[in-house]
Every structure is written in C-alpha cells, then in structure tokens.
Amino acid sequence: VYTDLEFELIKEDIKICKSLGVDGIVSGVLKPDNSIDIERTQTLIELSKPLPFTFHRAFDLIEDQEAALKQLIALGAQRILTSGGETSAPEAQHQLKKLVETSNDRIIILAGGGIKSNNINKLLKTGCKEFHMTANAIVKSPAAKAPIMLNASTIIPEQNYKASNLEEIINVIHELDTFFSKHD
C-alpha cells in the first residue's frame, strides 16, 4: 500500500533504473486488504517494459495466492518472489510446490527467504528453478566497542556489520549444480 507520492516515486525509480541499464524491475502494489492493486501494478508492469517484472514479497501477504498468481499472469508479470506466505521459503514447501504447479510455466516462482545450503535440496523438490538468498553473516568489526549505540539497532551492534558469506554462496551453487546436472 503506497501513498500517491510514494507511487510517483516508484514510477520515477523505474525510469531511472531503465536508463541505467538494469536487467529487470522488482516491485508491486497491494490494496489495504492485502489484495493486488491491479491498476497500479499494471502501471508498473507497463512502465517496466521491455524489462522483466518481478512482483515482490508483498505476495506473501495475500490470502488467496493462487488467484493472485493468475492475476499476475494476466497482468504480464514474469516472476513472483515469494516465501509461499510464510516467513521463510523452507516453511512453505507445500505452498511453493502448489504455486509452481498452478503457474504451469506461465510465470516463474522465485523462492526467497531463509534459503541456505542446508535446505536448498528440499526447496528444489518444490519445482522452483530460481532462488533468491541474502547469504549474509554478521561480521565483527575490529573497531573498539562503542560506548553508545548510534544506529538504534538492537539486532546488530554498531561495531558489527552484515556481509555476504562467500562460503554459503559457494555451497548453495554447488547444491544447485549437482541437482540440475542430474535433472537436465
């Protein structure tokens, strides 16, 4: 759900991204009842062309995901980034499989959220062929412990930061390569 000003900014962001040569657009709009805002989402999809459009994880807030999937196909979206309506994709394997089956190759189900090397094989059984992961880890900074918190974060102390976990990324790529080499 976006205000009119926020929606105008999203449209401007899409124009800027296109001018910069990005490979695709990830966005989407819901109504206050957590259904797809058809009119605004259609506007974003049209504005994104010829780039592929991915409807983001707002999809996970939608109650009737199968109906929403069909709406997004009709609107011309190419992909849905989803954890199947749960906090993480591994918690929603059954729903992800259902979405892949319902999509019937008309739209890509891009599983995302909580994906790691120790669960990617289970997610491959859903039929998903694309995955989104952060694969980050908290890195302890060599800086001295700050006497006060400047970032108001209770999750990551100020002297630490998140960084990509190369080992985890390599492990997931290995699992994917192994799976797809057996299923080609």
Outline where the language-model segments fall.
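Catalytic cores of alpha/beta
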Residues: V1-I16, D60-L75, K97-A111, I115-M133
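Glycine/small-residue-rich loop that forms an oxyanion/phosphate-binding "nest" at active or ligand-binding sites
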Residues: V1-T41
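Histidine/lysine/aspartate-rich catalytic loop segments that bind and position anionic ligands
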Residues: L44-P90
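Short secondary-structure boundary/hinge segments and terminal tails
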Residues: S35-I36, E63-D64, P90, I120, ...
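Alpha-helix-loop-beta-strand connector modules within alpha/beta enzyme cores
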Residues: V1, I36-R57, E91-S117, A152-K182
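Conserved short-loop catalytic and cofactor-binding motifs
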Residues: L5, G28-P32, H56-D60, S83-T87, ...
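An active-site metal/cofactor-coordinating segment within enzyme catalytic domains
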Residues: V1-I10, A144-I155
